[in-house]
Amino acid sequence: MPVPSSAVFECLLSLAAIKDVDARPTRTIDEVFTGKPLTTIPVGTAEDVEAAFAEAREAQANWAKRPVSERAEVIRRYRDLVIENREFLMDLLQAEAGKARWAAQEEVVDLVANANYYARVSAGLLKPRTVQALLPGIGKTTVGYQPKGVVGVISPWNYPMTLTASDSVPALIAGNAVVLKPDSQTPYCALACAELLYRAGLPRALYAIVPGPGSVVGTAIADNCDYLMFTGSSATGSRLAERAGRRLIGFSAELGGKNAMIVTRGVNLDKVAKAATRACFSNAGQLCISIERIYVEKDIADEFTRKFGDAVRSMKLGTAYDFSVDMGSLISEGQLKTVSGHVDDATAKGAKVIAGGKARPDVGPLFYEPTVLTDVTHEMECADNETFGPLVSIYPVADVEEAVEKANDTEYGLNASVWAGSTPEGEKIAARLRSGTVNVNEGYAFAWGSLSAPMGGMGISGVGRRHGPEGLLKYTESQTIATARVFNLDPPMGVPPTLWQKSLLPIVRTVMKLPGRK
């Protein structure tokens, strides 16, 4: 199926948390592949955000009272609806975000897997647990979890379903409400996921989508929420962290990256070259965890460069709403300008183009070829700065030591990839990298898809984690309840205070030696 109809967009628009839609100024949403208008979206205001929070707080109080099992069942129904509507969701992702269909399918798979994981584990994670008390048998200590309240989510355009719905699901299961600002370029992807959540039984006031500019809607969300989740640039993340810090609320963010791949002797270069095309050019390189630097041992660098260049040149660009295309479009003129600027700057300063290197307006207005450079030096803009597009540079290195040193020579630390002669060798190299996730024998998907493990960045690549238990519990306040069941620390009846105080330390030391105490 091609571009969604105007009736579909009209239906989704009715779900936006804006009361007087027809009276608002609007922003045009284009089909990325062609540049032709698809529809419009009303521009939200700070007042819309405040109204959404007022309704969300009322809805959240009732939602939090429902058993975790009931909340999880809503998410299971949502999961099933995603599967039923997968073709429509992929169509919308392609139209609004310009993805190749296989890249759109990655998002749909993530929606299903994420919802399934948190629906399955949430009851166990949120169940109050007994922990070691001060005095065994005499005291009892339990840890419980209360929802934060209303969570704010500010999501980006590059993965507009994964990074809206999949960040919201654990917050909702934990008993929170969510007020979300989608990126202004991809609001209907967020609304489509919201529609499925509502159909699954989620109260509408509990999950509010407020489209609008970040400077207005995003700021208002940051100023009203009880916890803030953000995905975007490191610069914007820093400003939001400062704002959250002034309010003393929790903050989590996945930010930029300049992700490295290491290739050592003994690998199957044909296999690595093929895998590297996906690692570098998924979603036209507009992926926070995609690879932009490849460090290859000198002995195999020429052969790898040739094989990788051949693989990249064979990639098919296109606008088809099917699986015949390898790479889709950039999303905006701004992204196209950044990629073109980085390539032009590098080649003007001596970099060599192995593959790609130019825009492709014959395919679509925002297409750029997947590009591979060599001879890149630090005075070139693309050497240290994130491109966030279909551009990767190859660097020959003397050995693994140099590869690790250069891979770690960055402010970022989001994702990395290692291809070594053996899996144990690859895992040893991985453990030395300053990166929140490292994939061995894979570019990014295994770490991202390991939903029971935390995902996030080191350095300026992020704060906090999504996925795993951390991705759910961050949306809660832990509460310790300690009960003195026999006596407390006051002297027992008939025991002089002086004698009691002298006895306390020996008692504690004895308790420390009991089995199971550490």
From Swiss-Prot:
<keyword id="KW-0560">Oxidoreductase</keyword>
<dbReference type="InterPro" id="IPR015590">
    <property type="entry name" value="Aldehyde_DH_dom"/>
</dbReference>
<feature type="binding site">
    <location>
        <begin position="157"/>
        <end position="158"/>
    </location>
    <ligand>
        <name>NADP(+)</name>
    </ligand>
</feature>
<feature type="active site" description="Proton acceptor">
    <location>
        <position position="254"/>
    </location>
</feature>
<dbReference type="InterPro" id="IPR016161">
    <property type="entry name" value="Ald_DH/histidinol_DH"/>
</dbReference>
<feature type="binding site">
    <location>
        <position position="386"/>
    </location>
    <ligand>
        <name>NADP(+)</name>
    </ligand>
</feature>
<feature type="binding site">
    <location>
        <begin position="181"/>
        <end position="184"/>
    </location>
    <ligand>
        <name>NADP(+)</name>
    </ligand>
</feature>
<dbReference type="InterPro" id="IPR029510">
    <property type="entry name" value="Ald_DH_CS_GLU"/>
</dbReference>
<comment type="function">
    <text>Catalyzes the NADP(+)-dependent oxidation of succinate semialdehyde to succinate. Although it has succinate semialdehyde dehydrogenase activity, is likely to act physiologically on a different aldehyde(s).</text>
</comment>
<keyword id="KW-0521">NADP</keyword>
<feature type="active site" description="Nucleophile">
    <location>
        <position position="288"/>
    </location>
</feature>
<protein>
    <recommendedName>
        <fullName>Putative succinate-semialdehyde dehydrogenase [NADP(+)] 2</fullName>
        <ecNumber>1.2.1.79</ecNumber>
    </recommendedName>
</protein>
<feature type="binding site">
    <location>
        <position position="255"/>
    </location>
    <ligand>
        <name>NADP(+)</name>
    </ligand>
</feature>
<feature type="binding site">
    <location>
        <begin position="232"/>
        <end position="233"/>
    </location>
    <ligand>
        <name>NADP(+)</name>
    </ligand>
</feature>
<dbReference type="GO" id="GO:0036243">
    <property type="term" value="F:succinate-semialdehyde dehydrogenase (NADP+) activity"/>
</dbReference>
<dbReference type="InterPro" id="IPR016162">
    <property type="entry name" value="Ald_DH_N"/>
</dbReference>
<dbReference type="InterPro" id="IPR016163">
    <property type="entry name" value="Ald_DH_C"/>
</dbReference>
<dbReference type="Pfam" id="PF00171">
    <property type="entry name" value="Aldedh"/>
</dbReference>
<comment type="similarity">
    <text>Belongs to the aldehyde dehydrogenase family.</text>
</comment>
